């Protein structure tokens, strides 16, 4: 059917490049967009605007439309830098309203299997920020994956000689969870990271 509509075939192919979108979902999305031309136009306009306006902050490397970003230019506590893998991770921390310092987005994690080395990340820029500023603490908030843990250990080795406090986000049992349903590795981390009451 799609061999007679190369433009539609291309749209489906582009949609399939998005994470979690397979052939059937891409087809469904393409046909939905074609049914409502105003949605198609709005989506095209939004994609064009994102491409034209969104960039990485020159200080923390988070995605932003303002450079430096509102967090870097907004008078936040610059003595503490929270290091995250992605802008999405930064947004999750912001939604928690538990942190009020500055950020540094690595734009990935060390992954030798995928060919991502420390030089491919924004680690050099982090070290330069620390050397230039009055940073007292770096909070490492990489994901609790093999890549995130590898990145955290690498960062800790790079940062400790600088004489600043280096901390890692705690990990443990999620709020509202029954212990019987939590995986053994998480229970181990929670037990090791227990605190006084």
UniProtKB/Swiss-Prot annotation:
Residue spans, zinc finger C4-type: 57-72
Entry-linked PROSITE patterns: RECR, TOPRIM
Entry annotated with the keyword DNA repair: yes
Record-linked InterPro entries: DNA_Rcmb_RecR, Rcmb_RecR, Rcmb_RecR_Znf, TOPRIM_dom, TOPRIM_RecR
CDD domains: TOPRIM_recR
UniProt keyword annotations, A-Z: DNA damage, DNA recombination, DNA repair, Metal-binding, Zinc, Zinc-finger
Domain Toprim: 79-174
SMART domains: TOPRIM
GO MF term set: DNA binding; zinc ion binding
GO biological process terms held by the UniProt record: DNA recombination; DNA repair
Pfam families with a match to the protein in the record: RecR_C (PF21175), RecR_HhH (PF21176), RecR_ZnF (PF02132), Toprim_4 (PF13662)
Function: May play a role in DNA repair. It seems to be involved in an RecBC-independent recombinational process of DNA repair. It may act with RecF and RecO.
Family listed: Belongs to the RecR family.
Protein name per Swiss-Prot or TrEMBL: Recombination protein RecR
Species of the source: Trichlorobacter lovleyi (strain ATCC BAA-1151 / DSM 17278 / SZ)
